[in-house]
Each structure stands twice: as structure tokens, then as C-alpha cells.
Amino acid sequence: MGTARFLSAVLLLSVLLMVTFPALLSAEYHDGRVDICSLPSDSGDCLRLFEMWYFDGTTCTKFVYGGYGGNDNRFPTEKACMKRCAKV
């Protein structure tokens, strides 16, 4: 039972790295931190249907979020997205 649990954890970690690593490569960094507004939209891994907003580099755009996973370029409202990401 212990070996199966360990292999499941390794598999889960591998999948998470495969999903996360490309997004991190495409992100912009400032002072060593990821600029979340430069991350691509990511609907996540589940099949729920939450209407959210992401910054596409120019403006905030609606997308459907699955409810789990994804990245931090995800906001509950257009106003929250613009407040965080729009450059004035």
C-alpha cells in the first residue's frame, strides 16, 4: 500500500510540473517574482463552470474556470482584473 501511494504522489507531482512549467516559462518576472498578469489564461483541471476574468496583455477578458488548478491570472470580476493588471 505504501509503494502505491508513493507512486501516486510521484505521478501527481509529475503532472503538475508538466502543466505548470510551460506557463512559468512564458511569464514575465519582476524582482524575481512572476507577474501574474503575464500568465496565459488557464481553465484549470475540473469541469465546473465558473465565469472568471484574466488579463490578456491588453485588457481583461472573460473565460470559464473549471474550479481547480490553473494559475493566478484569474479574477472574479473585470474590475478586480483591471485594478491588478491594467497599466495606467
From Swiss-Prot:
Its main location: secreted. Gene3D superfamilies: Pancreatic trypsin inhibitor Kunitz domain (4.10.410.10). CDD domains: Kunitz_huwentoxin. Residues 37-85 form the BPTI/Kunitz inhibitor domain. Residues 1-27 form the signal peptide. InterPro entries: Kunitz_BPTI, Kunitz_BPTI_sf, Serpin_venom_toxin. Disulfide bonds join C37-C85, C60-C81. It is found in: Secreted. GO terms for molecular function: potassium channel regulator activity; serine-type endopeptidase inhibitor activity; toxin activity. Belongs to the venom Kunitz-type family. 03 (sub-Kunitz) subfamily. This is Kunitz-type U15-theraphotoxin-Hs1f. Keywords: Disulfide bond, Protease inhibitor, Secreted, Serine protease inhibitor, Signal. The record marks L47, R48 as: Reactive bond for chymotrypsin. The record marks L39 as: May bind Kv1. It comes from Cyriopagopus schmidti (Chinese bird spider). GO terms for cellular component: extracellular region. Expressed by the venom gland. GO terms for biological process: envenomation resulting in negative regulation of voltage-gated potassium channel activity in another organism. Serine protease inhibitor that inhibits trypsin at a molar ratio of 1:1. Residues 28-33 form a propeptide. PROSITE patterns: BPTI_KUNITZ_2.
